Amino acid sequence: MTTPTAPAHEADAERRHEHRFQVSESIARLVMRTTANNLPLSRDDRPYQWSTTTYCDTLSWSIFRAAEKGSAMQLRIREYHRTRPREVLNPGTAWIEFKDDEQDTSLKERFGVPMDVARSFLRGSTTLPDPEHGLAERAVRLLRDGARPVAVTQYNRLAYNSLDSSLRITADHNLMYFALPWESRGDAGETPSPLGSLLSMEPDVIVEMKWYGDLPHWAVDLHAYLKENTREERPSKFIVAMRWLLGETDGTRKPKKK
């Protein structure tokens, strides 16, 4: 079955650089103050709106294993709320997101649909248009391989975006990682799924810079400042969430030695 109406659609025009930094609240305030002086507030992200992202993986954790090697195709469902929900896959608008990560670059495409359509897509009962980069087709293959929701992140995001979308800078506060109960992974029902155990809560702020082409001079200086004030680049939220879920971390920076 195909969705009867055309879903809202957003896609990156090309691969973009993507760097993440874990910083203190004071550094984050300085960074975002500088950003606000140079970029407009994103029209799609309201300040400190709750974002809930449900990540999928297969029984063999193939997406996570590929991501740790630097190349993976993420499949996730994103929801936006004014207050933090205690459940996921709630009624309303959902964004089905496909994100192809390759080292420090990414390519993202997403479709805004009613949540019942998103649930149907996860069951393999609904298809989506595949107009841009072939990401939807790759996501369908992951679902055929058994990909199901396994982990969730929730956070408040403050985002600034250039008018031509060539540069985006975000700060994520109150970031939390959750497991998703096993019964939430199957095809049962259309009711929201309760969050599982809280795996970890981030004490710091995650700042992300995403851009095409060359950075403007002020952003080059900002990027250098962030690098100087962090020990190492931050892994993706998906990688961190999966490390916590599988017990493969002593924290968010360093996996356990095997």
Regions found by a protein language model. Name each.
Residues 1-258:
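Phosphate-end processing signature that detects enzymes handling 5′-triphosphorylated RNA
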